[in-house]
Amino acid sequence: MTRSRSRALRVASALAAVALVAAGCDGSGFVPGTDGGAGDDETAAAAAPDAVVTANVKDEAADVSVDKVVRVRAEKGTLTSVVLRSKAGRVEGEIRGDGARWVSSAGLEPGTRYRVRAVARNAEGKEVQRVSTFTTQALSLEQQTYASIAPLQGETVGVGMPVVVNFDLPVTDQASFEKHMTVTSTPAQAGSWFWVSSREAHWRPQSYWQAGTKVSVDVAVNGVSAGAGIYGQEDRKVDFEIGAAHVYKVNARTHQMKVFENGRLLRTLPITTGKEGFTTRSGVKVIMEKYAQKRMNSETVGIARGSAEAYDIDDVKWAMRITSSGEFIHAAPWSVGSQGRANVSHGCTGMSIDNAAWLYSMTRRGDVVEYVGTDRAMEPGNGWGDWNVSWPDYVAGSALA
């Protein structure tokens, strides 16, 4: 091979190599040494979209109702944290639906600024945050009803004690309130709410409480609509305990009271009850109040001053109220000669000073006094007359029945 021939071959080989490289860049996408598949950019999955967080209260909203249930929702992701708070503290709530939504579970305070901070995470773990604020409506005290509860916190009461909730303003939407009113006990005992009026609700078990029962009352009505533009003012909670089972059985015909504790007869006491025209009521009564000494004036029970039946005694000893209308159990030393023999009182149950002092010393609010032997019935609304209502009728007195 001549020198010129050899150079020509080298040039031809170089041109061929350039042509092969150029072929690797043409529209076919074929690259020597590959199988002709798609490139890395085409096989990579598309990036997951960001989570989207929304709330049912607009940012900077004003005059939000205090009974508003705040809801936060996450789309294209899950909620990891939601905090609803004011300067006074956090509002309780919970994440539901596998992280899809958060719902508040407590009421809002009137005239208060709240901040909502929600964090959600998408499928790739990327977090987004939404922060918003709102202000609730202002309410006067005339637009808020406050609940008072009996028994008192920590009190030990008798087996007949109903839970008594009094509201200082009427509750017309009783069903809404009752949904937020609970009574739990250990051991558990079935019971029901009974609305005495728009201002008063009672709860009692089907039968007398078991001695030693521990009871918790939760009236969680803060921010709940009571109807007619009125809302619950605040939540109330009370814990109390049931003491020994005291049941006092009074027979107006035999003029005796049998005193039982936990089913065991302790004493039989001679007593007197209401005479003709002032008949003591028959039925189940509950000790409502206790006074070591109390003034009793006949005008408070409708007996006019100056009449033949009028009385005004400053120092009646060991008085225990059993009706709103004015029936008491108390010491009546002026009628000892009739006790155990005749009914001579104006409706109260009288006994000797010693017997009254003994009974007073063992008695608690809520102890039961069962009366028989007269033709005058105890009215359910005359004090804590809950046990004079049949169980079916009591259950029917619930706003949720």
Per-range role (PLM):
Residues 120-121, 221-223, 263, 293, ...:
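Short, charged beta-turn/beta-strand-edge "cap" motif at the junction between a beta-strand
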Residues 142, 150, 246-254, 387-401:
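Short peripheral tails and domain-boundary helices/loops at the edges of structured domains
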Residues 2-244, 271:
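Acidic, low-complexity Ser/Thr/Gly/Pro-rich repeat segments typical of extracellular/periplasmic
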Residues 201, 242, 249-252, 350-355:
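Short, glycine/acidic-rich beta->alpha junctions
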Residues 166, 170, 174, 290-294, ...:
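Structured segments of extracytoplasmic/periplasmic soluble domains
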Residues 229-337:
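Gly/Pro-biased beta-strand-loop elements
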Residues 71, 115-117, 131, 164, ...:
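Extracytoplasmic/secreted envelope proteins and their assembly/folding machinery
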Residues 159, 282, 298-401:
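Exported/periplasmic cell-wall-interacting domains
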